[in-house]
């Protein structure tokens, strides 16, 4: 049996409070809205009760953040792509921000189990003045649990339409990509953190983002396998390779906290679910 689930989230600023309205179909839900930072920022947790995806499953997530609203979204656990007999398992996420909206898209990692056929699509659309901090973390198997990624294929698509596009394929049979120093160099976790804007970044703010991330990198255990760049005036990207998810997540969380402070003048308040 395959699952086809959709979830639409719509955040609006009402009387200075970011309010969520949502519609779902299938096994994809959102938990109660929380406001640990006050009414201006709405925290939510997305849950997928089946716990993972197999061949033929699809998850479609549509998120809109209205003018002036601020949403932070995470998940309670990893997205797991299990072995497939042929059909791909697909997750599609579209984030759309209106003018002056802010959003933080901070799901936990996606785990690729051996034998999976998986696709992950993530797209952003930002109106002028909107800003997004988002990350994407992928683990190739669970090697420390004796479950390496030795078969399967993963397609990744990340896009800010008309501005920036990343598209790649990881095939477990591609030993040059997985093992070469010019590829993943034997690392089994890859992660990216993005700061994306609806308007071109002015140089002082761009430098704040770059310098803040580089200061964290210089003191981090992953400094030799991470870097931060500005490939477009509307995008700043930090990328990292790591032997395990925990190290990559530690780096991303630290840079996220710095970016929140220097770019938005807001202290980082971690979602409560992360402490469980």
Curated annotation (Swiss-Prot):
Keywords: Chaperone, Cytoplasm, Nickel insertion. GO terms for molecular function: nickel cation binding. Pfam families: UreD. One of its GO terms (cellular component) is cytoplasm. It is found in: Cytoplasm. HAMAP family: UreD (MF_01384). Belongs to the UreD family. UreD, UreF and UreG form a complex that acts as a GTP-hydrolysis-dependent molecular chaperone, activating the urease apoprotein by helping to assemble the nickel containing metallocenter of UreC. The UreE protein probably delivers the nickel. Required for maturation of urease via the functional incorporation of the urease nickel metallocenter. This is Urease accessory protein UreD. It comes from Albidiferax ferrireducens (strain ATCC BAA-621 / DSM 15236 / T118) (Rhodoferax ferrireducens). The gene is ureD.
